């Protein structure tokens, strides 16, 4: 039985998900690794496939920004769809070798994975003639869109588990008028543990594709600490030989250390200050290019990062680590968005802003 590496990822920005897929596809085409299966969640995002019609996006750019939903045109097949928290997105990177080069059969097998998964919850889902995806009556519960390059697959499925279905009002799902959307939670009338659904999906995938799934842990476990004074955020500038970019405080979790302990340690080591560190309820996964780690790890380098915040008076002296950084600065959120390079940093700062707005709303009503 062929092996397939299973990556159980956290929240992955859409851009980072595309970069990771591209890297894995290229490596699989060169036969530098075995088949891969990525299971993850995306932040709120609307994507338009190669065969899609932009008219199926019903919201203006201003409306999308107000909802904190991004929009991308992508390389997969299919029309328009929504990804967001509470969805299990699956990206199989498989080599369809001799005897398996049947695109229709491949899509049918993906559909079967989803049909059998929701059946575990007593939900009867079906294929629908002339429609993409998996359906419960007239409501879509899962979307499918794939890409195949040199007989290596990418993209895949999005299964609605505990998804905020209100965001689907921003689009005409898959360009189909008169149809609705649903989720496992909606069908059952209760939320469902995401890890439980992931486990079932992986088992059904292994069964249908006849693969031995081999769990692959992340290469690095990190923390990110967003230091702020309420209105501005602190960024550190990495030295040219260390990447030459602006970033929040970031550090590796040492053996025997909890993420919170790492966050507190990094705050002291990177700024010379102590402060109250709070978790922001977000863990992200992303790929790190080997040049930023001096090729210490074999590709692909996949990291997970737990997000924290810390309040610091901007008048306090900041003592940076000269081995890593050559400058620092306090910036408004708008200025920080212009300076940071990585989409996961942007997602982190948006989460901090949302937490600040929520705290302000509580103070206003009490």
Residue ranges of each PLM-predicted region?
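Charged phosphate-binding loop/patch that engages nucleotide di/tri-phosphates or the phosphate backbone
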Residues: 199-204, 208-217, 338-366
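Active-site segment of metal-dependent pyrophosphate-handling enzymes
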Residues: 128-130, 138, 144, 272-316
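NUDIX/MutT-family hydrolases
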Residues: 177-179, 307-309, 318-350
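Conserved Nudix-box catalytic region and its N-terminal flanking loop in Nudix hydrolases
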Residues: 104, 232-274, 366
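N-terminal lobe of the biotin/lipoate ligase/transferase fold
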Residues: 1-135, 140-141, 191-192
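Long, positively charged amphipathic alpha-helical accessory segments at protein N-termini or as interdomain linkers
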Residues: 7-9, 99-142, 147-217
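Short, well-ordered beta-strand micro-motif
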Residues: 41, 160, 227, 307-311
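Conserved N-terminal beta-strand and adjoining loop/helix that marks the start
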Residues: 216-233, 252-255
